[in-house]
């Protein structure tokens, strides 16, 4: 009788924990979807040259958009004071200004929405003691990263308000990289709550070895994302619009024309695009190799599915990247390429989770 009662209590506790974990995981995945949208909107904001249209940072008051004609005139006048207007958009009409303003406004508004969607459930779960100390620490860490991302966004915008017509490529890349880190943290915690144990028929040592390979690939994809941030930051995609060669060269001659030499990796259009291409080539060889190795093991169906999706997303992303380059970075394909980077990264994270 005591044994039966013990099992009943244990079952109730287990079911309650499972429900809590499922709720938290769904909430985190919703936040992931919002961050995905944020990355895409941020990419469009950059591609349309809209990022400097709002020259102030007002986290609360800035939520209210301009309503009257006077409000719009004030905002346009503030924009006229920065170098980008003087050197690129001089003579811009109010209607033209509205076109770039709304992209930056929605980008910031989406950032505020993400903060709200994360903060309110986070406080609820903590107050109701739905999370243990370990999980609570992870969720708090993600919240702190989100706050830092808001500061990083404004720090990036500041770099284009005084002396430059565009934001710093260093700060842009840091802003993009931090978005991917936040996304990865939420996705990893969520998938861990949904599927804490993986069952494979394959030899555990072989699965661990494949898992190490997957983590290396994920790191390489993240590194490629950072490289893409530099490409975007210095508009390197507008040059060398040929493939597979760079205007007739596999290794172009202008790779190290800047001094000191290390500046070329960040400021030289030729070198920055070359680096991005080389990382892409490396992934084009290593991910299919990983896929073939995974096929040789008896993985779970979800593990096999994750590996298939990784290969599919690689092919999709390569096609989008080449098309974007050949067409000199059109808005639609460039935005799709940035979205593809998130999806490729997601597939790699899921593979790592399935092999962990």
From Swiss-Prot:
One of its GO terms (cellular component) is plasma membrane. The keyword Transmembrane helix applies. One of its GO terms (molecular function) is oxidoreductase activity, acting on NAD(P)H, heme protein as acceptor. It is found in: Cell membrane. It holds the Pfam family COX15-CtaA. It is an enzyme of class 1 (oxidoreductase). Heme binds at residues 276, 337. One of its GO terms (biological process) is heme A biosynthetic process. The chain crosses the membrane at residues 24-44, 106-126, 139-159, 174-194, 216-236, 272-292, 309-329, 331-351. Interacts with CtaB. Catalyzes the conversion of heme O to heme A by two successive hydroxylations of the methyl group at C8. The first hydroxylation forms heme I, the second hydroxylation results in an unstable dihydroxymethyl group, which spontaneously dehydrates, resulting in the formyl group of heme A. This is Heme A synthase. It comes from Nitrosomonas europaea (strain ATCC 19718 / CIP 103999 / KCTC 2705 / NBRC 14298). The gene is ctaA.
């Amino acid at each position: 009788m005591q044994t039966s009662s013990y099992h009943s209590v244990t079952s109730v506790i287990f079911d309650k924990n499972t429900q809590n974990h499922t709720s938290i995981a769904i909430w985190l995945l919703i936040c992931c979807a919002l961050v995905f949208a944020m990355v895409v909107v941020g990419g469009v904001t950059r591609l349309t040259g809209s990022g400097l249209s709002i020259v102030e940072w007002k986290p609360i008051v800035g939520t209210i958009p301009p309503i009257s004609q006077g409000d719009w005139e004030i905002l346009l006048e503030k924009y006229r004071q920065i170098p980008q207007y003087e050197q690129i958009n001089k003579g811009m009409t109010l209607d033209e200004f509205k076109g770039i303003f709304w992209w930056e406004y929605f980008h910031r508004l989406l950032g505020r929405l993400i903060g709200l969607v994360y903060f309110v459930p986070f406080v609820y779960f903590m107050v109701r003691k739905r999370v243990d100390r370990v999980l609570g620490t992870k969720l708090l860490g993600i919240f702190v990263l989100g706050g830092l991302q808001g500061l990083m966004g404004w720090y990036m915008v500041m770099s284009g308000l005084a002396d430059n017509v565009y934001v710093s490529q260093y700060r842009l890349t840091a802003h993009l990289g931090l978005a991917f880190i936040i996304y990865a943290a939420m996705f990893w915690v969520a998938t861990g709550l949904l599927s804490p144990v993986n069952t494979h028929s394959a030899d555990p040592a072989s699965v661990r070895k494949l898992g190490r390979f997957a983590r290396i690939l994920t790191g390489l994809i993240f590194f490629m994302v950072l490289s893409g941030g530099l490409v975007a930051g210095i508009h390197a995609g507008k040059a060398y619009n040929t493939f597979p060669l760079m205007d007739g060269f596999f290794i172009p001659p202008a790779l190290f024309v800047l001094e000191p030499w290390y500046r070329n990796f960040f400021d030289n259009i030729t070198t920055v695009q070359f680096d991005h291409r080389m990382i892409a080539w490396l992934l084009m060889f290593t991910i299919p190799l990983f896929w073939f190795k995974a096929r040789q093991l008896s993985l779970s169906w979800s593990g096999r599915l994750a590996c298939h999706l990784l290969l599919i997303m690689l092919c999709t992303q390569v096609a989008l990247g080449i098309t974007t380059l050949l067409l000199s970075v059109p808005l639609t394909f460039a935005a799709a390429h940035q979205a593809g980077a998130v999806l490729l990264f997601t597939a790699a994270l899921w593979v790592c989770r399935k092999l962990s």
